[in-house]
Swiss-Prot record:
Keywords: Heme, Iron, Metal-binding, Oxygen transport, Transport. Heme b binds at H57, H86. This is Hemoglobin subunit beta. Gene3D superfamilies: Globins. The beta chain is a component of adult hemoglobins B. And C. The keyword Ribonucleoprotein does not apply. The keyword Iron applies. Belongs to the globin family. One of its GO terms (biological process) is hydrogen peroxide catabolic process. Hemoglobin C tetramers polymerize by the formation of disulfide bonds. The deoxy tetramers of hemoglobin B and C associate to form molecules believed to be trimers (B+2C) of very low oxygen affinity. Residues 1-140 form the Globin domain. It comes from Aquarana catesbeiana (American bullfrog). GO terms for cellular component: blood microparticle; haptoglobin-hemoglobin complex; hemoglobin complex. Heterotetramer of either two alpha-B chains or two alpha-C chains and two beta chains.
């Protein structure tokens, strides 16, 4: 459940995991790079994986998810401004929120091996989907 997710996220190195996840999103789904045109060199997988702006934004995303999940009954309100920014200003395809959630799960499984049980994966998936829905709210 939610408390398991919170306890797990508290242990996660946000820069390492968030940064790797955002880098992988940009590599695996290269069309997402258009949202990060101000981030400098995204010319290769290696450049993306070592780009300090990508790593910092990945950390910011994971910090935001951890903080947002402390407001489960109020997620849409918590993410209202961020949702408007991603929809109105940045025109991010909301499907990318779900893609990033899936990539985060992949990276977390890589980092946490045995501790990353199917039950934890299920709880994280539900949590990331809820965050994705809250962020997609600005699109309706």
């Amino acid at each position: 459940g939610g408390s398991d997710v919170s306890a797990f996220l508290a242990k996660v190195d946000k820069r390492a995991v968030g940064g790797e996840a955002l880098a992988r999103l940009l590599i695996v789904y290269p069309w997402t790079q258009r949202y990060f045109s101000t981030f400098g060199n995204l010319g290769s997988a290696d450049a993306i994986s070592h780009n300090s702006k990508v790593l910092a934004h990945g950390q910011r995303v994971l910090d935001s998810i951890e903080e947002g999940l402390k407001h489960p009954z109020b997620l849409k309100a918590y993410y209202a401004k961020l949702s408007e920014r991603h929809s109105g200003e940045l025109h991010v395809d909301p499907a990318n929120f779900y893609r990033l959630g899936n990539v985060l799960i992949t990276v977390m499984a890589r980092h946490f091996h045995e501790e990353f049980t199917p039950e934890l994966q299920c709880a994280l998936h539900s949590s990331f989907c809820a965050v994705g829905e809250a962020l997609a709210k600005g699109y309706h």
